[in-house]
Amino acid sequence: MIDCRGVSFSYDGVTPALDGIDLNIEDGEFFCILGGNGSGKSTFAKHLNALLQPDAGTVRINGMDASDPELVYDIRSTAGMVFQNPDDQLVATLVEDDVAFGPENLGVPSAQIAQRVREALKGVGLVGFERHETHALSGGQKQRVALAGVLAMEPRVLILDEASSMLDPRGRKGLMKVCRALHDRGMTIVMITHFMEEAAEADRVAVFRAGRVAMLGAPEEILTRADELAQLNLDMPASCCLGRALREKGVPVCAQVREVDMVAEIAQVYAERSGADVAGRPSASDSRVLDHASSAADGMVASEPVIEISHLSHSYSLSARERRRWRKRSTTVGASGKQTLWGNDPNSPWALRDVSLTVRRGEFLGLAGHTGSGKSTLVQHLNGLIRPQEGSVCALGLDLSSKKGAAAVKAKVGVVFQYPERQLFAETVAQDVAFGPRNLGLPQDEVVRRVATSLARVGLDLAAIGDKSPFELSGGQQRRVAFAGVLAMEPEVLVLDEPMAGLDPAARRDFLELIDRLHREGLTVVMVSHSMDDLANCCDRIVVMNEGAVFAEGTPAQVFAHANELKSIGLGVPAAQRMALSLVQAGVPLRCDKLYTVESLADELAGMLLGCADGPLRASRQAGSKMATQEEGC
């Protein structure tokens, strides 16, 4: 289906973005491409539907030469592409018009277009959103509209360029289910991703480095090679990390790339050594969800509130009179209004519904929730970007209902949006970082000091890059400059809306370390994230949003003890916790009141498995340790 031979490409004529790529993707194959930021993945993807032409080499799609201008229309009808950022792809003001755009341009009859639009929206869980305006959707909902628009074209090849990066856990699961169904029907899937769990579902995996194919093979061959992946800024799947940690402790298990296989193997080992039956049993998370009104984070030292939100409601579509009328109606959302695969209520006019919460000085607060749950709307209230319609927001003693308060708070509560590098606009790095302090009317020497200090705080040197255009920098450096521009305002509260979106695992770790350091320096941090692992590792307290309302709050251990409730609203738990709960269901007696990491889970399992029998398992410890030093897989 796709045949690439000696494909090379450069954006500037000097630095190769692709360097002699030889790759063949079979008809009907599920093919995954991994690689660090800047490795050439997206550039390669754009060659597969003739958005870019190679400087050297050939790209053939279903036998068609992608360099032939006469074949571009046919190639783009054959290979549909979903980009990482949906704003780069949406073209219409209404959802149904956007989804219909592709089929209309293919000359599909009107009756068939209507049917395709219905089926595509059903496939991505957006039934009922046909007449919604695309600009009013959340980032994840926009991504699903973009996917529906490509599905409605019925291509033979579906190219996904990190299309899951803005989706919540249920959205990613829904996307994978759609991909598997299309794959089962014979469609060729080319998926670019940073999620190793998605790569584990592919038929084959290629890993890019500096525009070349560094690794190629089945997921079981590629995803278990920890050292090589680390050199490529990638991680093993959590299941492989657990398997490796267990082998290092003497437990002879394989590094399974799929969690379900890892859980089954550990449960089988436990059953063999303990004599217990491997049978399902009730999950430890079947208890009642946290009462968000009374579940303050246990063990946290109380500190003064910096932001207080009381009974906040917001609608993008209702007038004040209509809001009063709606408030008389029940605020509960019936199950019939939800779409079980993706999760939505298309009939609700509320972005926020009666939200009350407090952010305390010095804490690291996480915000979780499905796409469209109101997270971004909520954080835009925290520094006056949106003023309260109903209820109140008080930040650092300022009433944000007033214009004066909303204006004054912007210097004290800094917001970094999704893809913060898109906040850059000035000719030089120094000018961009200086923009905020200058608008505060600060003296020039103070502006210069803040620019240098804020760049240093994010690991950049003013002398080295201050006079450069921010658009000459790498993506990671641009993101750091955007952070510096907010820090130059010297805020007391830093609000981060999905700050790690689109980053490879190594860059993600770097930014998490940066954010953690800023927190330890005294900043109060509020972070929105779809990564349950990031929230578990960083936050003192987590607030969970659902359909515009606070669903639960508590410490990470408290919140993630309720896996079933979180799953019901489109969320999940950290990977290690997910495997631990699956092991409990399989009959392995792990503790249920504990938040596990891969390391702590491996420690507890090793102690249990090595202690439950004196015979074959203990005798195999030496062999298991030896195996751990060899190839990562089995």
Regions found by a protein language model. Name each.
Residues 34-36, 368-370:
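The feature captures the beta-strand-to-loop junction immediately N-terminal to the Walker
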Residues 133-137, 141, 469-473, 477:
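Conserved ABC ATPase signature
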Residues 158-161, 494-497:
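Catalytic Walker B motif of ABC-type/P-loop ATPase nucleotide-binding domains
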Residues 154, 490:
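Conserved catalytic motifs of ABC-family nucleotide-binding domains
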Residues 49, 383:
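Helix-to-loop junction immediately C-terminal to a conserved catalytic motif
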Residues 57-67, 75, 391-399, 409:
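Conserved ABC transporter NBD signature motif
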